[in-house]
């Protein structure tokens, strides 16, 4: 199993409330996506990111499919239009 974890900071935290449902809606649209969990930060510390996504895939090929899937690319394009910074980690478990 592969976990794909991404933390986003937008120029405006309100964007996280738009992005989370867009990411969650990818379930059922991207065949290799096994689960999608999103969360919005409530601590508002200066070092916090606004939101996190945790997605799971059966294998690296599934993650690769997700990365280039047209539905994911639409969401990614929007995220990049409002993004200040992000970090990600992909790991096998």
Regions found by a protein language model. Give the residues of each.
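Short S/T/G/P-rich N-terminal loop/turn motif that feeds into the first structured element of a domain
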Residues: 1-50, 58-68, 84, 91-93
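Short, flexible helix/strand-to-coil boundary loops that buttress conserved ligand/catalytic motifs
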Residues: 67, 76-79
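NUDIX/MutT-family hydrolases
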Residues: 72
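Short, hydrophobic secondary-structure boundary micro-motifs
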Residues: 75-76, 91
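Short glycine/proline-enriched turn or capping motifs at secondary-structure junctions
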Residues: 79-86
């Amino acid at each position: 199993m592969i976990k794909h974890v991404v933390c986003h900071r937008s120029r405006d935290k309100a964007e996280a409330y738009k992005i989370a449902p867009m990411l969650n809606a990818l379930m059922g649209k991207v065949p290799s996506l096994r689960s999608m969990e999103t969360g919005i930060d409530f601590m508002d510390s200066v070092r916090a990111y606004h939101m996190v996504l945790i997605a799971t895939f059966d294998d690296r090929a599934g993650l690769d499919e997700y990365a280039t899937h047209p539905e994911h690319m639409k969401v990614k394009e929007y995220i990049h239009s409002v993004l200040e910074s992000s970090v990600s980690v992909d790991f096998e478990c």
